[in-house]
């Protein structure tokens, strides 16, 4: 009898402990295309810190290693590793669909970063690249017309002409920005530089040989800009004189410490770059997941919900170098002066 009473007391004490046990933290898979990239390192680090502080959630990096197949395989690991949610960065959307749909059926919250994921309808977090691309195009056109009012504008872009989001976020709005200043500007179009900086270098060499009149260049990623500027230098171009263009004006994407040296060099023709902020991006990707969890955003819809987050126009003319240094130090944790 005493044993039965003792057992009853023990059980009575245990039940409230079980009932009031702390809930398990939400586990979030945070996909990046390449964790060796400083932007992706910084946005993951911020997402991890932000999710823990604001939501008590745990964030885990899923590195795509710049390999489309690895990115797709990582989707299977979302289920295998018991994740509650995932924010995806995928290159092959069609290949990813089966894994995404399987995860959705298991009640896992799925979102995408940069591009809507095929017709899955999962919400997408995107950077507002179009606004900054337009601004850079307009500013470059104004500066060229100021320096050379009688020289017609001839522009070219190097990037990903067949990538929907790059076209809508970078190429097209840049062209519109230029045309808003000079409706008669000539556009040579977007050249396919998807194979990297070496191919980009040859493309630019060919362009300036065949069209020496080209004077506005949008190099649509910082790695491509390495090839762009190398080509211009080899061709005897890429020059400014104390802040005034001599041969052309170049803008880029993915502003970083390396690009800052050229942007604020009064004798380099690289004068603007789109700053993609890892802090706002990392936080935005987490907030989108939590908005789905709270019911503010539907898990799927047609068309997919798209949330846009701020980008920055880092410009020799409109952003003082001290502000650019502060931006880099804040966003990337550098200690520049």
Residue locations for each model-derived region?
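Hinge/cleft segment of the Venus flytrap/periplasmic-binding protein
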Residues: 24-26, 158, 166, 276-337
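Extracytoplasmic "Venus flytrap"
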Residues: 26-46, 50-54, 59-77, 81-83, ...
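Short, solvent-exposed amphipathic alpha-helices that sit
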Residues: 39-53, 132-139, 165-185, 203, ...
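Short beta-strand elements at the ligand-binding edges of bilobed clamshell
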Residues: 63, 117-142, 157-159, 190, ...
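Hydrophobic alpha-helical
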Residues: 76-79, 85-105, 174, 192-262
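Flexible loop/hinge segments that line or gate small-molecule binding clefts
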Residues: 93-131, 256-265
């Amino acid at each position: 009898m005493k044993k039965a009473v003792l057992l009853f007391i023990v059980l009575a004490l245990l039940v409230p402990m079980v009932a009031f046990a702390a809930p398990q933290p939400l586990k979030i898979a945070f996909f990046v295309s390449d964790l060796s990239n400083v932007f992706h390192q910084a946005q993951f680090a911020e997402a991890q810190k932000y999710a823990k502080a604001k939501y008590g959630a745990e964030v885990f990096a899923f590195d795509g290693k710049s390999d489309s197949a690895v990115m797709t395989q990582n989707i299977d690991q979302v289920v295998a590793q018991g994740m509650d949610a995932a924010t995806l960065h995928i290159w092959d959307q069609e290949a990813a669909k089966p894994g995404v749909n399987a995860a959705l059926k298991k009640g896992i919250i799925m979102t995408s970063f940069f591009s809507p994921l095929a017709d899955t309808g999962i919400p997408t977090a995107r950077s507002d690249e179009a606004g900054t691309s337009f601004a850079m195009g307009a500013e470059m056109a104004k500066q060229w017309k100021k320096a050379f009012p009688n020289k017609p504008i001839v522009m070219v872009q190097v990037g990903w002409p067949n990538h929907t989001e790059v076209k809508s976020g970078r190429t097209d709005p840049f062209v519109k920005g230029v045309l808003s200043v000079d409706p008669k500007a000539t556009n040579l179009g977007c050249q396919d530089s998807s194979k990297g900086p070496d191919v980009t270098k040859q493309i630019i060499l060919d362009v300036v040989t065949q069209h020496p009149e080209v004077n506005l260049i949008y190099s649509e990623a910082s790695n491509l800009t390495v090839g762009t500027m190398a080509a211009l230098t080899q061709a005897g171009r890429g020059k400014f004189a104390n802040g005034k263009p001599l041969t052309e004006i170049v803008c880029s994407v993915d502003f970083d410490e390396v690009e800052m040296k050229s942007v604020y060099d009064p004798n380099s023709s690289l004068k603007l770059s789109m700053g993609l902020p890892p802090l706002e991006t990392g936080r935005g990707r987490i907030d989108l997941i939590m908005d789905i969890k709270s019911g503010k955003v539907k898990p799927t819809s047609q068309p997919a919900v798209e949330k846009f987050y701020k980008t920055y126009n880092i410009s020799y003319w409109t952003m003082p170098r001290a502000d650019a240094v502060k931006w880099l130090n804040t966003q990337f944790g550098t200690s520049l002066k």
